[in-house]
Structures are given as structure tokens and as C-alpha cells.
Amino acid sequence: MQTLLKLLSDGRFHSGEELGALLGVSRSAVWKRLEGFERDYGMVVQRVRGRGYRLEEPLSIISPRSDSGPWPLDVLFSIDSTNAEVLRRLSAGAVAPFAVLGERQTAGRGRRGRQWESPFGSNLYYTLGITVRGGAQELEGMSLVVGLAVAKAIQALGVKDVGLKWPNDVLVGGKKIAGILLELTGDPADICSVAIGIGINVNMRTAYAIDQPWTSVREVQGGQVDRNELLQALESQLAHALSRHRERGFAASREEWESLHLWQGRQVTLSTVANNIVGRALGIDERGALRLLVDGKEQSYSGGELSLRLSDDS
């Protein structure tokens, strides 16, 4: 499957005879595998008599690293969830840091139990497993630091109008382009393992399970994007951001994060499990908590199942 897909990833026509010879199988076997692509991966294969087969459009396949990278990276053809896989490996004693990237996810998930749409070869589904030895102090603001790193990686590709929504959504033009999900095992007050899940909409053009305005790097750039280039930028930004966070805490990133905060000074509604809180967004504190002006008094909010939305049109 993987070899055939790589052969077709250039978007050009390939005859069944050519593909069969390269794979060492019959033309009918090639046909069956292509049917499997369409059935199992939702990919469109064009068939033209006398020319052969090609994918509806080229695919940007993740290539093996040309260098060592900041940590080991395992690229998987298909996985239920990169977060779930990293948590399994951490529980089995894998040595952190390490990362897992899936070409597709069959059970991708986001914050608050939401499904994360994960078509094959379209986006980045990436999870970094790390060990945190600084306890709660190191965990404070970590998701915001990761969001900032993701925003800067997207900016590195020339994307404009990139902004952040507390706590960790990345938006372009007011539409979601990336999200972060942190899950941990162990004692958060002492030593624990953290799975830092990152999903970035890269080349996706159609989605059926996204219940909010969204966009992709391809949509805003006007053409297909090399996912390898974005992956390299992401890992570089992540390595720098997490190192700074470990050494200096969230305070070192606070000003830069607020400079990208789209709702700074806006009237917002913060939804909690118990109620809705309306106030003006003042920014974030040195722990990454959201600062709101509520009924003339400043309040701070962090952790738990919190959701923020605009409540004004200014």
C-alpha cells in the first residue's frame, strides 16, 4: 500500500503494467489496491484508458528526516490517534522525548472530547512525548507556549494574519487552522509524562466533522503546501519554545503570546461546567491564566473544561 501510494503521489499517470512491474504484482492486484485506497482512505483515483491511473491531485508525503532532528520521530501510515499511541509508548517505558506523526488518524481527538478530522496525507497529526520534572510550575502555561510555537511555524511559511485564541487554538483570518491537546500521566505535582498533541490543517479542502469555521494553510496560500517544510519549522519552534519554558517559565513567553492574542481587550464569554462568565479580556498572567474584567473586578481563570467565545462585534 505505502509503496504504491508513494509512486502515485506525484499526481501523474502511471500505467497498470508499470505499477505492477515496480511492485512485483499483477495489474489486477494493482486495481484491487487502488480500490482499497478509495474505500479505506477516501482518496480519488482517476482512471483513463491508454494512460493509466493517477491520484486526483498530488500528495505531499512526509519524507524521512535528512538529519537527526531535535528528538526521534516515528512516521506511521495509519494510527487511531497519535496522542493515544504516544501515551501507550510512555506507559510501556519509552524514553522521552520522542514524537509520532500519523499520515492519517482513524480516531483523532481534540479538546473536550471532540473528533479531529484526519484525512490521509492532508494535514499534520503530530504528538510529542516529554517528561516533565518541574511539577506544576513547569506545566503552567505549557499549552499556550505550544500554541505560540505552532503559530510561529505557520508564520514561517509566509502565512499572514495568524493569531491565538486562549487557551490554545491557532486561527488565521478568524478561522481555526490548528489546535493543541495536552494529556498527561503520572503525578502533575512531581514527575509526569505529557503527550503534546498538535493538529494543523495543511492541505485539507473538504471536511465533514468540523463544527466551527476553519481554514488550512493551502486555502490561505492558494496552493498545495509541502508538509515536510511545515514539519521542520514546527519541530524547530517547539524545541526552542519548550527549552525556554523549562528554563524560564511561561513569563518568558507571555508578552509574545499576548501580541498574537486576537481577543485582547474584547468582550468575551467564558463557559465553564457551572456557568457562563462575561467580561473583557485583559490578557493572561504569568501562569497562563486568562485575565478578565468582570463587573469592574479583575478575575483569573485557568484549567478545567473552559471554552471562550466573543460576545461583542467590535
Which role does the model predict for each range below?
Residues 1-26, 32-33, 134-162, 172-314:
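Long, positively charged amphipathic alpha-helical accessory segments at protein N-termini or as interdomain linkers
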Residues 1-156:
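N-terminal lobe of the biotin/lipoate ligase/transferase fold
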Residues 169:
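Conserved active-site carboxylates
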Residues 48, 119, 165, 284-285:
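A short, compositionally biased micro-patch
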Residues 98, 160-165:
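A short coil-to-beta-strand element that immediately follows conserved catalytic motifs
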